[in-house]
Amino acid sequence: RSGTVGGNICLDTRCYWINQSETWRESIDWCHKCDCGTGADCRVIPNQNTLCVATYQADLAPVLMCLDATIHLASPQGKRSMPLCDFFKLDGMTRNILEPGEMVTHITLPEDASDWSGDYQKLRQRESWDFPEAGVAVLWKGGEGDGPSSLRVATTGLESIPSLHSEEAEDALENWSGLETVEILSESIRKAVKPVQNTWFSPSYRRKMVKVLTKRACRKLLVS
């Protein structure tokens, strides 16, 4: 079997209230994403039926976002393109801006994509093929001194969309001092993510591991 880049980017959001059999859901009531006309409440954050918080768990998006990728769409109505960061929509139901009948045709990278170095680290249940419970991509361009000239960080598996942490990366770049800055950056990314209780690991553990994953992804940066 094989997959596609577009298929990975458009991966449906996951939540253990929706990723179940019909019999299982029927036995304990439905959920906001799969209410089958019952108007069921969100099981993760009750008493609000305005937002589904199912988690986006694809691996490619954070790396491509750090590379400033452009996604290209086509439909019978025409074509359109946008930065990949603008493709996602903070809603576990819709998850992106694709219209009915529209599809991803291709993704392009800027000319300087090969100038970037980086690493991607993920938390998963098994050390094999698996969806990330948390994923962190760190990409950088080498500088003339000890630190990088450019730095980008993005995460996945923690909310309904992948996130590019531009402010945290810019702060780290402006105040670069090696290992100390990596520690500060890792903590700032940990504080920025907002996982909820809808995957295998608890939100608190996933946030703690985001800090660890960010440090791991920065290891090559410290020795490059």
Say what each PLM segment does.
Residues 1-224:
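C-terminal structural segment of proteins
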